[in-house]
Amino acid sequence: MARYIGPTCKLSRREGTDLFLKSGVRPLESKCKAEAAPGQHGQRRGRLSDYGVQLREKQKVRRIYGVLEKQFRNYYKDAARIKGATGENLLKLLEGRLDNVVYRMGFGSTRAESRQLVSHKAILVNGKTVNIPSFQVNVGDVISVREKSKNQLRIQNSLGIAGQRADVEWVDVNTEKKEGVFKRCPDRADLPAEINENLIVELYSK
C-alpha cells in the first residue's frame, strides 16, 4: 500500500497545525515554519469555502492517523453503521488501530514509526504476532513488544519521549515489561479538541 514518504513538516504546514508526525514533544514552531503553507507562495492562505474547510479537516485527520483515502472512507462507512455519533465512532475506530495503540502506549515515537514496528513483526497482540497496522484492537487486549525487539534503542527512546507527553488514560502500560493493556475505548473528551469530526460527517453526507 502506498504511503507518503516526503517531508512531514510539509503536511503539517499544509494543514496549518501540528499533526504530530515528528517525534519528540517540541511544538511544531520549533521544528518548521508552522504559519506558512508549503510552496513558493506559502504565505498566501486564501479564504476557504465551506466545502474547502470540510475537506481540509478530513485531510488533517487522515494524515494524523496515516490512513489513505479509500481506507479512510471505509472507516467512515463502518462508523456510520455503529450506534451513536458517527464522527465520534470514526475517531474511536482510528484510535483502535494497532499502529495507533502502539503509539499511544509509547513504543513508537510517531505513528509512522509504530506502523513500522508492527509491519516488522516486533509487536504481539495477546502473545501472537500481528503485522497488520490496521488491525483493530479490542478492549482487554494485551499489546507487547516481542522479546527479541525489546532492546531496540528506538523503543527505549520512544518510551522516554512518551513519558513527557500527557498520560493516555485508556491504556495501561508497564514500561519495564514493555507491554500494555487497551483498557477501554477513549471518550471524546480524551481526544484532541482541535479535531472537528462533525466537518467530516458534513463532507461525506453530501
Swiss-Prot record:
Alphabetized UniProt keyword annotations: Ribonucleoprotein, Ribosomal protein, RNA-binding, rRNA-binding
Cytoplasm among keywords: no
Alphabetized SMART domains for the sequence: Ribosomal_S4, S4
GO BP annotation list: ribosomal small subunit biogenesis; translation
Location of the S4 RNA-binding domain: 96-156
Cellular component GO terms, alphabetical: small ribosomal subunit
One matching Pfam family: Ribosomal_S4
An example Gene Ontology molecular-function term: rRNA binding
PANTHER family reported for this sequence: 30S 40S RIBOSOMAL PROTEIN, SMALL RIBOSOMAL SUBUNIT PROTEIN US4M
Entry's family note: Belongs to the universal ribosomal protein uS4 family.
Primary role: One of the primary rRNA binding proteins, it binds directly to 16S rRNA where it nucleates assembly of the body of the 30S subunit. With S5 and S12 plays an important role in translational accuracy.
NCBIfam families reported in the protein's UniProt record: PRK05327.1, rpsD_bact
Quaternary structure annotation from Swiss-Prot or TrEMBL: Part of the 30S ribosomal subunit. Contacts protein S5. The interaction surface between S4 and S5 is involved in control of translational fidelity.
Official protein name in the record: Small ribosomal subunit protein uS4
Naturally occurring in which organism (per UniProt): Saccharophagus degradans (strain 2-40 / ATCC 43961 / DSM 17024)
Gene this chain is encoded by: rpsD
